Amino acid sequence: MGRDICTLDNVYANNLGMLTKLAHVTVPNLYQDAFFSALFAEDSLVAKNKKPSSKKDVHFTQMAYYSEIPVGGLVAKLVPKKQNELSLKGIQIEFLGVLPNYRHKSIGSKLLKFAEDKCSECHQHNVFVYLPAVDDLTKQWFIAHGFEQVGETVNNFIKGVNGDEQDAILLKKHIS
């Protein structure tokens, strides 16, 4: 039996640059480099003998490889309790992207399944994502994977790299 052509692996400090590049290619002008470098900021503070903050977010990160070529990535965050009226409790997908030439090969579905599995492991019941309101293609992909829109459009919720603000929608999927 052959091995799977699409595999997932953890993101480490040494391949974080690849995840950052994938994000810039798949969703241009949305993520700053600081967003990704913050994923490993606590590790670098400990290495420099500085005191890490006591409040640490729990992130789950994965890289998707197609025939050993990095083609996609996922950054998800555990939200153990509701922060405000615009948030939910569960696993928030902060970034899920696959290079255009590798879409429709179930790579995104594998990354989403990883987030759903983490949701169950953490005893949570919701996977949710904020999307730009104008991104109908991504919205339809999430809806096809069992997500539904929650509430109305949130004005000026997403801030891009250039400082421009976009309206957002919240999509969620309930995990039993």
UniProtKB/Swiss-Prot annotation:
PANTHER family: N-ALPHA-ACETYLTRANSFERASE, N-ALPHA-ACETYLTRANSFERASE 50. GO terms for biological process: mitotic sister chromatid cohesion. It comes from Saccharomyces cerevisiae (strain ATCC 204508 / S288c). The keyword Cytoplasm applies. GO terms for cellular component: NatA complex. Present with 2370 molecules/cell in log phase SD medium. The gene is NAT5. It holds the Pfam family Acetyltransf_1. Keywords: Acyltransferase, Cytoplasm, Transferase. The keyword Isomerase does not apply. GO terms for molecular function: protein N-terminal-methionine acetyltransferase activity; protein-N-terminal amino-acid acetyltransferase activity. It catalyses: N-terminal L-methionyl-L-alanyl-[protein] + acetyl-CoA = N-terminal N(alpha)-acetyl-L-methionyl-L-alanyl-[protein] + CoA + H(+); N-terminal L-methionyl-L-seryl-[protein] + acetyl-CoA = N-terminal N(alpha)-acetyl-L-methionyl-L-seryl-[protein] + CoA + H(+); N-terminal L-methionyl-L-valyl-[protein] + acetyl-CoA = N-terminal N(alpha)-acetyl-L-methionyl-L-valyl-[protein] + CoA + H(+); N-terminal L-methionyl-L-threonyl-[protein] + acetyl-CoA = N-terminal N(alpha)-acetyl-L-methionyl-L-threonyl-[protein] + CoA + H(+). It is found in: Cytoplasm. This is N-alpha-acetyltransferase NAT5. Belongs to the acetyltransferase family. Component of the N-terminal acetyltransferase A (NatA) complex, which is composed of ARD1, NAT1 and NAT5. Transmembrane segments: none annotated. Residues 14-176 form the N-acetyltransferase domain. N-alpha-acetyltransferase that acetylates the N-terminus of proteins that retain their initiating methionine. Has a broad substrate specificity: able to acetylate the initiator methionine of most peptides. Non-essential component of the NatA N-terminal acetyltransferase. Its EC number is 2.3.1.258. Its main location: cytoplasm. CDD domains: NAT_SF. It is an enzyme of class 2 (transferase).
